[in-house]
């Protein structure tokens, strides 16, 4: 089993480049199934396990997919299979995003009920409600969701009960080839939604209003391949911004888009962090003393739930009492217990956590409970006394490329090792930590 070992106490300095956005590239690759003519070339694709998984799904469905040099080439002009089995979908719940394109392109989709990360129930009822409104017949049973329509999907007016990102993406893709106009209301406004709409419009689609609460899609008869550049990953950018702040560092986060990070920038500045827009990215300078704040996660443009655990690590360094309220997902405080193992003063009260700081974090062996928690525990390790050993790295690898190497390049004392190949010196250091 692999683990990351962090020896705390180093200030981070330098420049780090942000990868293409994981949460943008997965729906864009899925949307490539809509193109019945020509191949698509998707650029700035991060080399993440989730990307390899969605590529496997498309190959299984009959598309020709190549991935090299951060470019994914997809040719989906062939006859497509319409079933995505559990062996693929269990690895990543975003696999359900092939449902909209398959239904629009072929009139049929059979997709295993999704797996993926363990953050609450994350139901897909909003996806199915939308498909039904467009004329599809839905059956759920034996571990599968099956959707079928005779002829083309029909344009419809659809109101989402919650601005679900996945439902918004799936319904945009389904509506792109539907007959007539589809109006989606109370939709997600994330930058990744805008990126998907731009991609489909480049393929010949007619989508207006992405990034607002209402999106109108005028269906077309066919779409073609196109070359597209993925937007930078705002969550990776935010994670490195927190890394700079927590270590009293000075880091240029190259590729960070200020307009995608408005709420995070506001909250970090409220804590006393200096953030400067330098055109090519954001420079983040951490203060000697951080101020306590309250955060409530909300759908975009509110504070992103995917930055909640990283900010919890930062708030442990703030002088006073802070509160984080999680409104997007239930059961997303599992990392709080891991922070407690590192001497964090955290109390969970329903959907909120109370954080008392500042505390001197202590190195410990901790487990990543989900993707963002893994990054947050490493951030805590950057300022912990002694050694922090983070396990369950499979979660981290779903969302970050070379995370430990990028931190090391900024000055962190960090390495990734196999338990079996851990050096004798590292084992001695671990014993020293435990005896301290």
Curated annotation (Swiss-Prot):
<dbReference type="GO" id="GO:0071555">
    <property type="term" value="P:cell wall organization"/>
</dbReference>
<dbReference type="InterPro" id="IPR005750">
    <property type="entry name" value="UDP_GlcNAc_COvinyl_MurA"/>
</dbReference>
<dbReference type="InterPro" id="IPR050068">
    <property type="entry name" value="MurA_subfamily"/>
</dbReference>
<feature type="binding site">
    <location>
        <position position="306"/>
    </location>
    <ligand>
        <name>UDP-N-acetyl-alpha-D-glucosamine</name>
    </ligand>
</feature>
<dbReference type="InterPro" id="IPR013792">
    <property type="entry name" value="RNA3'P_cycl/enolpyr_Trfase_a/b"/>
</dbReference>
<dbReference type="GO" id="GO:0019277">
    <property type="term" value="P:UDP-N-acetylgalactosamine biosynthetic process"/>
</dbReference>
<dbReference type="GO" id="GO:0008760">
    <property type="term" value="F:UDP-N-acetylglucosamine 1-carboxyvinyltransferase activity"/>
</dbReference>
<comment type="similarity">
    <text>Belongs to the EPSP synthase family. MurA subfamily.</text>
</comment>
<keyword id="KW-0963">Cytoplasm</keyword>
<feature type="modified residue" description="2-(S-cysteinyl)pyruvic acid O-phosphothioketal">
    <location>
        <position position="117"/>
    </location>
</feature>
<comment type="function">
    <text>Cell wall formation. Adds enolpyruvyl to UDP-N-acetylglucosamine. Essential for cell growth.</text>
</comment>
<feature type="binding site">
    <location>
        <position position="328"/>
    </location>
    <ligand>
        <name>UDP-N-acetyl-alpha-D-glucosamine</name>
    </ligand>
</feature>
<keyword id="KW-0670">Pyruvate</keyword>
<dbReference type="GO" id="GO:0051301">
    <property type="term" value="P:cell division"/>
</dbReference>
<dbReference type="GO" id="GO:0008360">
    <property type="term" value="P:regulation of cell shape"/>
</dbReference>
<feature type="binding site">
    <location>
        <begin position="122"/>
        <end position="126"/>
    </location>
    <ligand>
        <name>UDP-N-acetyl-alpha-D-glucosamine</name>
    </ligand>
</feature>
<keyword id="KW-0132">Cell division</keyword>
<dbReference type="Pfam" id="PF00275">
    <property type="entry name" value="EPSP_synthase"/>
</dbReference>
<keyword id="KW-0133">Cell shape</keyword>
<dbReference type="InterPro" id="IPR001986">
    <property type="entry name" value="Enolpyruvate_Tfrase_dom"/>
</dbReference>
<feature type="binding site">
    <location>
        <position position="93"/>
    </location>
    <ligand>
        <name>UDP-N-acetyl-alpha-D-glucosamine</name>
    </ligand>
</feature>
<keyword id="KW-0961">Cell wall biogenesis/degradation</keyword>
<keyword id="KW-0573">Peptidoglycan synthesis</keyword>
<dbReference type="InterPro" id="IPR036968">
    <property type="entry name" value="Enolpyruvate_Tfrase_sf"/>
</dbReference>
<keyword id="KW-0131">Cell cycle</keyword>
<dbReference type="GO" id="GO:0005737">
    <property type="term" value="C:cytoplasm"/>
</dbReference>
<protein>
    <recommendedName>
        <fullName>UDP-N-acetylglucosamine 1-carboxyvinyltransferase 1</fullName>
        <ecNumber>2.5.1.7</ecNumber>
    </recommendedName>
</protein>
<dbReference type="GO" id="GO:0009252">
    <property type="term" value="P:peptidoglycan biosynthetic process"/>
</dbReference>
<keyword id="KW-0808">Transferase</keyword>
<comment type="pathway">
    <text>Cell wall biogenesis; peptidoglycan biosynthesis.</text>
</comment>
<feature type="active site" description="Proton donor">
    <location>
        <position position="117"/>
    </location>
</feature>
<feature type="binding site">
    <location>
        <begin position="22"/>
        <end position="23"/>
    </location>
    <ligand>
        <name>phosphoenolpyruvate</name>
    </ligand>
</feature>
């Amino acid at each position: 089993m692999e683990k990351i070992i962090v020896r705390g106490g180093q200030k981070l300095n330098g420049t780090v480049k942000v990868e293409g956005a994981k949460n943008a590239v997965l729906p864009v690759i899925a949307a490539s199934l809509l193109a019945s003519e020509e191949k698509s070339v998707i650029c700035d694709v991060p080399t993440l396990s989730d990307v390899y998984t969605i590529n496997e799904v498309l190959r299984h469905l009959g598309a020709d997919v190549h991935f090299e040099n951060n470019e994914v080439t997809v040719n989906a002009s062939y006859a497509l299979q319409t079933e995505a089995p559990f062996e693929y979908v269990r690895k990543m719940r975003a696999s359900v995003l092939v449902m909209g394109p398959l239904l629009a392109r072929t009139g049929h989709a059979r997709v295993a009920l999704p797996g993926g990360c363990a953050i609450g129930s994350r139901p897909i009822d909003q996806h199915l409600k939308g498909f039904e409104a467009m004329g599809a017949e839905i059956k759920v049973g034996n571990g599968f969701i099956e959707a079928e329509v005779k002829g083309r999907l029909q344009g419809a007016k659809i109101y989402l009960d919650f601005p679900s990102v996945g439902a918004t993406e799936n319904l945009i893709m389904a509506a792109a080839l539907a007959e007539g106009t589809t109006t989606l209301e109370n939709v997600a406004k994330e930058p990744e939604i805008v990126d998907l709409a731009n991609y489909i419009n480049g393929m010949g689609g007619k989508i207006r209003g992405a990034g607002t609460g209402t999106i109108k899609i005028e269906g077309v008869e066919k779409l073609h391949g196109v070359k597209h550049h993925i937007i930078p990953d705002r969550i990776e950018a935010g994670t490195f911004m927190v890394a700079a702040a927590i270590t009293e560092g000075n880091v240029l986060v190259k590729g960070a888009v200020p307009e995608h990070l408005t709420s995070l920038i506001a909250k970090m500045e409220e804590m006393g962090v200096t953030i400067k827009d330098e055109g090519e990215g954001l420079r983040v300078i951490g203060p000697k003393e951080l101020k306590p704040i309250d955060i409530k996660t909300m759908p975009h443009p509110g504070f992103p739930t995917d930055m909640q655990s990283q900010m919890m690590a930062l708030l442990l360094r703030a002088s006073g009492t802070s509160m984080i309220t999680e409104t997007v997902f239930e059961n997303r405080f599992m990392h709080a217990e891991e922070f407690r193992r590192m001497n964090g003063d955290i109390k969970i009260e329903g959907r909120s956590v109370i954080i008392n700081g500042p505390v001197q974090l202590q190195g410990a062996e901790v487990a990543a409970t989900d993707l963002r928690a893994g990054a947050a525990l490493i951030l805590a390790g950057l300022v912990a006394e002694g050694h922090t050993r983070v396990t369950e790295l499979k979660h981290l690898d779903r969302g970050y490329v070379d995370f430990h190497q990028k931190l090391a390049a900024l000055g962190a004392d960090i390495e990734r090792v196999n338990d079996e190949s851990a050096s004798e010196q590292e084992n001695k250091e671990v014993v020293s930590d435990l005896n301290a």
